Amino acid sequence: NTATVYLLGSVHFMRKDIYPLDSKIEDAFKKSNILVVEANINDAAKADIQRLMANAYYPGSDTLDRHVSRETYDLIKKETERLGIPIQMINKQKTWIISLTLSSLELLKLGFTPADGIDMHFLSRAGGKRIIELESVDYQIRLLSSFSDREQELFLLYTLKDIKTIRQEMEQLLHTWKSGDTKGMELLISKGNSGDAQLAPIYEKLIYERNRRMISRIEEFLRTGETYFVVVGAAHLIGDRGIVRALMDKGYSVEQN
């Protein structure tokens, strides 16, 4: 009855020209004494980085070509050659880290960087605010590496397809984000996986299972007398199975500013 939780959908790769943010957002941040993020990248322990390296590479003599089809391997080779990266440089990398690397490189070329991401913007300005992680770097690494070879390959194929239209999609995402158009953002984000039933189990683990965990934590916050500023990926907030809808269904008062 006494807690306030501000929810802000993050875009993890952002452009500098998005700043300064709307004063309503900054005012909510100033009013909050606790900052909540998915994972505190600034505080990522050395052990987390070592765990990332261990989970991102095939052990021993194992290589990428043993884990994807010949057709997919050729597509990866074509894409890396376009980027000026010899296939030999990534042949030890697992498929999930290649997916993240390829999409990240495209975003960087378009001027979107993780350093300018919404979550990093607030982490860098947390000052004396207490910082709470809804997840952790370690949890996210374990989640991504838990997918089967086939699931990782499907996600990579989706990434290779998505890269072709990433400029247009990011511009649309920026427009919906800045205008607070949750329906437009929902359509944009769901468009990518709606046509492929094989992606549904992946989306279930990447979004909906994590939503349930986050909702449980946010409910804990709402039972305190504190004011929280929660920054999570925008995809977690929107839609019929998103965090906002779940909180409303549970009887909490939710308003969009």
Predicted regions and their residues:
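A cross-kingdom marker for long, charged
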Residues: 201-257
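Structured, acidic catalytic/metal-binding patches in enzyme active sites
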Residues: 1-202, 206
